From Swiss-Prot:
Lineage: Bacteria, Pseudomonadati, Pseudomonadota, Gammaproteobacteria, Moraxellales
Required cofactor(s): Mg(2+)
Protein name (database record): Deoxyuridine 5'-triphosphate nucleotidohydrolase
Organism: Psychrobacter cryohalolentis (strain ATCC BAA-1226 / DSM 17306 / VKM B-2378 / K5)
One Pfam family named in its UniProt record: dUTPase
Protein EC: 3.6.1.23
Length: 154
């Protein structure tokens, strides 16, 4: 995979020490943290959603990869802060600002502060199969057309 290009859209990211280019928290981290590129604290009311900019654009280029914006586990578990779209899928050819839909699913207001780590970005491989229209499948699987709950709970 070639290098992923990152374009700084907001000068705060390079000029303000509270902000920074995204990094991995540890050597074993799969994703990089995305920070809230806001000027002042933002109160997200219980049950509300807000679209928050990151001040960054990312261009993957290689169609065999995509970006995924995922929630941070601590924010979700401790504060009920998750993504409004649950997972953000960023196509390889997208060049606009990375935006994060933040949803406060808790019963209490949440204050998002400038430069707070609010989500994570992971680059993943993408399978790009050809699709063949058929009238019948060539094999019958053990599952067949069994849908929601067909295998039980235990």
């Amino acid at each position: 995979m070639q290098a992923v290009q990152v374009k700084v859209l907001n000068p705060k990211i390079t000029e303000d020490k509270a902000f920074s280019l995204p990094t991995r928290a540890t050597d074993g981290s799969a994703g990089i943290d995305l920070r809230a590129c806001i000027d002042e604290p933002l109160t997200i009311k219980a049950g509300a959603t807000h679209l928050i900019g990151t001040g960054l654009a990312v261009y993957i280029q290689d169609p065999n990869f995509a970006g995924m914006i995922l929630p941070r586990s601590g924010l979700g578990h401790k504060h009920g802060i998750v993504l409004g779209n649950l997972v953000g899928l960023i196509d390889a050819d997208y060049q606009g600002e990375l935006m994060v839909s933040i949803w406060n699913r808790s019963q209490e207001d949440f204050v998002l502060t400038p430069a707070e780590r609010m989500a994570q970005y992971v680059v993943v491989p993408v399978a790009r199969p050809e699709f063949e229209v058929v009238t019948e499948f060539s094999d019958t699987s053990a599952r067949g057309a069994g849908g929601f709950g067909h295998s039980g709970r235990q």
